[in-house]
C-alpha cells in the first residue's frame, strides 16, 4: 500500500465577500418604481442569453428581486422583452 503524503495543505484564505446594496432600497433608488413597461431598467437585470440575473449578481434584496422577476415576466408576455436571445 502506498503511504499518504504527510504534508498537510493550508486552507486557502477566505476572500471577503463584497455585499452589494439593493439599488431600490438605497436613498437614490427610493423613488424608482419597478414597472413592466420600463424596459430600459429591466434590461439591466437580464443576461445576454435572456435569463433573469440572480440576486447574488444584481445585489437586490429579496422583495425587489421578486418584483423585478415578475415585471420581466410580464414584459415578456406583452412582447416588450424577448423570451430568449436572438443570437446563438
Swiss-Prot record:
Q: Give the UniProt keywords, A-Z.
A: Ribonucleoprotein, Ribosomal protein, RNA-binding, rRNA-binding
Which SUPFAM superfamilies did the record assign?
Answer: Ribosomal protein S18
Provide one Gene Ontology biological process annotation.
translation
Any Pfam family matching the protein: Ribosomal_S18
Extent of the signal sequence: none
Q: Name one GO cellular component term.
A: cytosolic small ribosomal subunit
Q: Which InterPro entries match?
A: Ribosomal_bS18, Ribosomal_bS18_CS, Ribosomal_bS18_sf
GO molecular-function terms, A-Z = small ribosomal subunit rRNA binding; structural constituent of ribosome
Q: Which domain of life is it from?
A: Bacteria
Family membership: Belongs to the bacterial ribosomal protein bS18 family.
Entry function: Binds as a heterodimer with protein bS6 to the central domain of the 16S rRNA, where it helps stabilize the platform of the 30S subunit.
* Subunit comment: Part of the 30S ribosomal subunit. Forms a tight heterodimer with protein bS6.
PANTHER family named in the record = 30S RIBOSOMAL PROTEIN S18, SMALL RIBOSOMAL SUBUNIT PROTEIN BS18A
Q: What is this protein called?
A: Small ribosomal subunit protein bS18A
What species is this protein from? Answer: Mycolicibacterium gilvum (strain PYR-GCK)
Q: What is the lineage of its organism?
A: Bacteria, Bacillati, Actinomycetota, Actinomycetes, Mycobacteriales
Amino acid at each position: 500500500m502506498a503511504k499518504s503524503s504527510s504534508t498537510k495543505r493550508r486552507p486557502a484564505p477566505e476572500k471577503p465577500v463584497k455585499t452589494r446594496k439593493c439599488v431600490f432600497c438605497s436613498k437614490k433608488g427610493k423613488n424608482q418604481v419597478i414597472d413592466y413597461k420600463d424596459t430600459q431598467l429591466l434590461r439591466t437585470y437580464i443576461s445576454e442569453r435572456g435569463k433573469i440575473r440572480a440576486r447574488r449578481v444584481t445585489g437586490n434584496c429579496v422583495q425587489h428581486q421578486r418584483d423585478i422577476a415578475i415585471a420581466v415576466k410580464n414584459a415578456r408576455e406583452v412582447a416588450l422583452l424577448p423570451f430568449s436571445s436572438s443570437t446563438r
